[in-house]
A protein has these predicted regions:
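Carbohydrate-binding surfaces of carbohydrate-active enzymes
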Residues: 1-174
Length: 175
């Protein structure tokens, strides 16, 4: 209805002949698709070699343009409090000892959350690259991943970060 109303308005406003409406594209039947194999990210990284660094590395530092990076940090002492990732680009799911504890997002301006990491605990931060900024003043801020220090209660978490690149540019080996 809106299409025809706008078209009729245009026909009154232009001096040339408006072309005929194109024929409708036929709808086709798509057969049922069965997805019978799955693999979770934690299983995928179990067999991968991590890149290690004192601080989290960006996607660009890891020579990765798309997909996800899993940032992992082992703690030999318990730590709890407000975790802040001021330089998150773009979206992260946070796990402690394999259990999802929250989400952070540049889009919704959520860059902090409470964490409680027990003795010998593991913090996993799965960061998704949601695409590149390609216009405007923020075009120069196009680094992806964790781009600034991770802090808990204001203390920078350094040493022994492991990064697992998951570009999702090919099917994972699920054998």
């Amino acid at each position: 209805e809106k299409y025809n109303a706008i078209r009729a308005l245009m026909m009154k406003s232009v001096a040339y002949k408006v072309p005929a409406v194109p024929a409708r594209i036929p709808v086709i039947a798509i057969p049922k698709i069965s997805l019978n194999k799955t693999v979770d990210v934690m299983t995928m990284v179990a067999g991968m070699k991590a890149v290690e660094n004192d601080t989290p590395m960006t996607f660009e530092d890891l020579n990765q343009g798309t997909g996800y990076v899993l940032y992992r940090r082992h703690f030999n002492q318990p730590i709890s409090g407000m975790m802040r990732i001021k330089g998150l680009a773009d979206y992260a799911v946070v796990y402690v000892n394999g259990t999802k504890v929250g989400e952070l997002s540049r889009v919704t301006d959520v860059d902090s959350m409470e964490v409680n990491i027990p003795f010998n605990g593991v913090l996993d931060i799965l960061v998704e690259n949601m695409g590149r900024i390609n216009y405007g003043a923020r075009i120069v801020e196009s680094f992806k991943g964790i781009t600034k220090p991770v802090t808990i209660e204001g203390n920078e978490i350094t040493g022994n970060w492991q990064m697992y690149s998951l570009p999702m540019d090919r099917m994972p080996d699920m054998t």
